[in-house]
Amino acid sequence: MGTILDKIVDQKKKEVAALYETYTPVKEKRKTRSLVKALEQFTVIAEVKRASPSKGDINLHVDVRKQVKTYEGCGAGAVSVLTDGQFFKGSFYDLQTAREESSIPLLCKDFIIDKIQIDRAYEAGADIILLIVAALTKEKLKELYSYVLEKGLEAIVEVHDEKELEIAIQLNPHVIGINNRNLKTFEVDLSQTEKLGKRLNEEKLLWISESGIHSKEDIICVKRAGAKGVLVGEALMTSSSIHTFFEDCKVNI
């Protein structure tokens, strides 16, 4: 029996095959916005997340335009949009809608295993692509990272443990994302940020913390560890006061 990640990657292979049958990439270039620049100060990457395998439906019928406008108004440095349909109930249409509404950097959050997905994300308006080390071979990761650069985009290379971190460091990527969630079990452990953050601080690499960030205390924890930003989905999608969450992120340490 495979892990949750195995099931997701198997589904992505089917989606990629379908894309090659139905989608022709657009050749024209466009301007992009920089997450690296946004991370010059502590930044919240605020996520549009309808559902997840671990939580089920979170905010299934969210008005993407309204949510993105709220995020930007509250001071988000970037917006992340889940585009996976099968497991997270997102879509490239959600990404395109966010692009129409937002002037800040936009992250395509998906399980990218092929260049054609990057083409699709680019056309929908993404500025940043998530590349998950756990979902890719070293060779494929390097190939996709090079393609992200070729398209004029930035990448967040996501890791969960020491082994994945060493693979990511070899790329010297724009940004490394420490995912506190184990994608094989979907369990969350915020201490991963502190553990892996030490190594990234030694390397003087730009990094953010992802998953399991719900409170002011969590923000203080990741700031102290050296993170330059946080990617937050569920906490914002279920919050009765998004503004308060952003105010908490301004805490000095």
Swiss-Prot record:
It holds the Pfam family IGPS. It catalyses: 1-(2-carboxyphenylamino)-1-deoxy-D-ribulose 5-phosphate + H(+) = (1S,2R)-1-C-(indol-3-yl)glycerol 3-phosphate + CO2 + H2O. GO terms for molecular function: indole-3-glycerol-phosphate synthase activity; phosphoribosylanthranilate isomerase activity. Signal peptide: none annotated. InterPro entries: Aldolase_TIM (IPR013785), Indole-3-glycerol_P_synth (IPR045186), Indole-3-glycerol_P_synth_dom (IPR013798), Indole-3-GlycerolPSynthase_CS (IPR001468), RibuloseP-bd_barrel (IPR011060). Pathway: Amino-acid biosynthesis; L-tryptophan biosynthesis; L-tryptophan from chorismate: step 4/5. CDD domains: IGPS (cd00331). Its EC number is 4.1.1.48. This is Indole-3-glycerol phosphate synthase. SUPFAM superfamilies: Ribulose-phoshate binding barrel. Belongs to the TrpC family. It is an enzyme of class 4 (lyase). One of its GO terms (biological process) is L-tryptophan biosynthetic process. It comes from Bacillus thuringiensis (strain Al Hakam). Keywords: Amino-acid biosynthesis, Aromatic amino acid biosynthesis, Decarboxylase, Lyase, Tryptophan biosynthesis.
